[in-house]
Amino acid sequence: MNNKFYKEEVVMACDWFSDLYTNKRLPSHDCISKWFNEYYVESFPVRNAYVTTFGFPLLTKEVIAEITSAINSLVHVGGGVLTVLELCCGSGYLGSLLKENGMNVICTDNNAWKNDDPVHGHGNFFQKPYTEIEEIDALEAIEKYKDKADVIILSWPEYESELAARVLEKCLEYNISMIYIGEREGGCTGDDEFFDIMEERCNERFISDSYIPFPGIHDNIYLVTKKPELVK
């Protein structure tokens, strides 16, 4: 491959992809599909640019509508608007889009990634927050909002970290549904304990028919709830 030509293609791909999100705010499924058909080879550097600006899930209008629909499908004992607690929200991009869809979202993050190496770590991520973000540890956030939260969103929990398992245990303890965005067991999110708990104690289902992962990535969006026989 001609290296100069490839670099030019990458620049074009990045510019087009950036335009999809800056000019249209949130592109459609068809726009993203068209982009992948045109620039599949250049998608890896573009993913890096997207992740450091917005976050790991590739969001479209349809995906946000599907997440909103899944949240609204949950039984809310008190009536009214459901409250969403987003943990480890990064830039707050997902939460900001759900707010625009009428959701009541509390976005939280401990911001530990800001202390990472900007070259080899996450120190250069998310220079622009998209909504108000409360700086608090994930488990502390659950304890603080357990009586308000109807659903917890956990997106791309760190690989081999026990955090996802601890969060899921808290969700089960307090009967709070979870929306999990990430890869399955053997992928790059969560750890074995997290997936063991999910298999043994939870029901899960896809909530997005339109989600498109970046090439080489195998994430999807799941609604995770306690198995009915375990609900007291």
Question: Where does each model-flagged region fall?
Answer:
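S-adenosyl-L-methionine
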Residues: 1-78, 111-151
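Conserved class I S-adenosyl-L-methionine
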Residues: 81-90
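Conserved acidic residues
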Residues: 82, 150-151, 176
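Conserved SAM-binding loop of SAM-dependent methyltransferases across substrates and taxa
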Residues: 91-103
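Conserved SAM-binding motif I beta-strand of class I
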Residues: 104-110
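A short SAM/SAH-binding and catalytic strip from SAM-dependent methyltransferases
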Residues: 149-162
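C-terminal substrate-binding/active-site "lid" region of AdoMet-derived donor-dependent transferases
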Residues: 159-230
